């Protein structure tokens, strides 16, 4: 709402600063560090630390993926629209509180004309985040993370068709690795479903295979929904003149009525179904997870902007590629995803493909501008993630 770093969450948020000189509203003002220089603990040592910013970004991304998987993994869970609506509501409330507290200073007043122009983009966003949660519901975290790479390929060739983009040989090689990692991941998943429990459990194998097929179908839809959202947003965003928090605010605000209407129409709101979705033994944890997932959209965006500010957009891109590995491993650790030779190989190939892709983008940017990427204007969190995704 990637990565693309936790792509669906980041693309749901920022567009980018209107100028290179525009500072992130959460970050310390000039001179603030000097005033604190004599204090026992200098906060600027933390806020200006590249290592801490990278660690914070990685932890925020991992926690968001793990939280989403936990919330939608219940055996009877079927309220995805409602879950996403709560995410958006929590995010909007958090933005308003931050604005009232003076932490956000560049959020423009609501503009009805801009909202009407942006509404079709919000509909595409609903399709993207809904199919994302459905895919995550049926697939393991490692497989989900690996298959998300395919979105980069679709967006890249969408760029070629509609925006005159280009695909370099090194980027094409990374695409081949992404496809290979997805094929290996699917093969490993299917093999484990068919033979992991032995022939005596053929009924369970059939059920597991059916679940995987549903997950792959939702993942395929998510790839094209994400590409449609990113490419359409790029076309519209230029005339909107949105700043950082404007995009996040409109994206979440405009999706709230759509998500609630879809929930009331397509989801079962009977007391019996609500009890199944929120069983007494896990109800409090689920509610806390839903609230945190809304706050995490802000955490990820802030940590991304922080990482770019104290490092560079190049470092941020590389961190996003490297972050694929711990996100995939988190699925093995927290959700007991099957650890097989095939699954580990797929994770490794996907990890390498991300590094090759980031390297290809660095080389492409260098050849275009004939300057080091570190001298280019610093971009905000999702501005960079959207650019990484859309300018493949």
Swiss-Prot record:
Subcellular location: Golgi apparatus membrane; Cytoplasmic vesicle membrane; Endoplasmic reticulum membrane
InterPro entries tied to this protein: TPT_transporter
Lumenal topological domain residue ranges: 67-76, 140-142, 192-210, 268-285, 338-340
Renumbered residue ranges of the record's region Disordered: 1-25, 373-392
Compositionally biased tracts (Basic and acidic residues): 1-11
Residues with attached carbohydrate: 268, 273
GO cellular component: cytoplasmic vesicle membrane; endoplasmic reticulum membrane; Golgi membrane
Segments in the Cytoplasmic topological domain: 1-45, 98-116, 166-171, 232-246, 307-314, 361-392
Membrane topology: Multi-pass membrane protein
Domain of life per record: Eukaryota
Keyword Cytoplasm recorded: no
Alphabetic keyword roster: Cytoplasmic vesicle, Endoplasmic reticulum, Glycoprotein, Golgi apparatus, Membrane, Sugar transport, Transmembrane, Transmembrane helix, Transport
Residue spans crossing the bilayer: 46-66, 77-97, 117-139, 143-165, 172-191, 211-231, 247-267, 286-306, 315-337, 341-360
Protein family according to the UniProt entry: Belongs to the TPT transporter family. SLC35D subfamily.
Primary role: Involved in the import of GDP-mannose from the cytoplasm into the Golgi lumen.
Binding partners and assembly: Homooligomer.
NCBIfam families: nst
UniProt protein name: GDP-mannose transporter
Native source organism of the sequence: Botryotinia fuckeliana (strain B05.10)
Name of the gene encoding the protein in the UniProt record: gmt1
């Amino acid at each position: 709402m990637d990565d693309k770093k936790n792509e669906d969450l980041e693309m749901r948020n920022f567009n980018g600063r209107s100028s290179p000189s525009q500072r992130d509203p959460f970050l310390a003002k000039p001179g603030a560090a000097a005033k604190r220089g004599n204090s026992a603990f200098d906060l600027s040592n933390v806020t200006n630390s590249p290592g801490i910013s990278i660690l914070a970004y990685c932890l925020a991304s991992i926690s968001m993926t793990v939280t989403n998987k936990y919330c939608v993994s219940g055996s009877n869970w079927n309220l995805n629209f409602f879950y996403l609506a709560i995410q958006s509501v929590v995010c909007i409330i958090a933005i308003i509180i931050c604005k009232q507290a003076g932490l956000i200073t560049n959020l423009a007043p609501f503009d009805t004309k801009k909202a009407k122009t942006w509404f079709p983009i919000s509909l595409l966003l609903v399709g993207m985040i809904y199919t994302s949660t459905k895919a995550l519901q049926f697939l393991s975290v490692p497989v989900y993370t690996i298959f998300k790479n395919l979105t980069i390929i679709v967006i890249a060739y969408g760029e070629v068709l509609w925006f005159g983009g280009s695909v370099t040989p090194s980027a094409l090689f990374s695409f081949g690795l992404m496809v290979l990692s997805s094929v290996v991941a699917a093969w490993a998943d299917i093999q484990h479903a068919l033979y992991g429990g032995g022939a005596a459990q053929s009924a369970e194998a059939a059920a597991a295979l059916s679940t995987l097929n549903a997950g792959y179908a939702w993942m395929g839809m998510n790839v094209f929904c994400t590409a449609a959202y990113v490419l359409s947003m790029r076309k519209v965003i230029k005339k909107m003149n949105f700043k950082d928090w404007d995009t996040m605010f409109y994206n979440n605000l405009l999706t709230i009525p759509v998500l609630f209407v879809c929930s009331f129409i397509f989801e079962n709101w009977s007391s019996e179904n609500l009890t199944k979705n929120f069983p007494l033994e896990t109800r409090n944890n689920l509610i806390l997870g839903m609230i945190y997932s809304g706050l995490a959209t802000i955490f990820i965006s802030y940590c991304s902007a922080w990482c770019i500010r104290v490092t560079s957009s190049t470092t941020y891109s590389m961190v996003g590629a490297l972050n694929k590995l711990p996100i995939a491993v988190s699925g093995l650790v927290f959700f007991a995803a099957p650890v097989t030779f095939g699954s580990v190989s797929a994770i490794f190939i996907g990890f390498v493909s991300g590094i090759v892709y980031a390297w290809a983008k660095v080389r492409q940017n260098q050849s275009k501008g004939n300057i080091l990427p570190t001298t280019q204007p610093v971009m905000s969190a999702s501005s960079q993630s959207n650019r990484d995704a859309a300018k493949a």
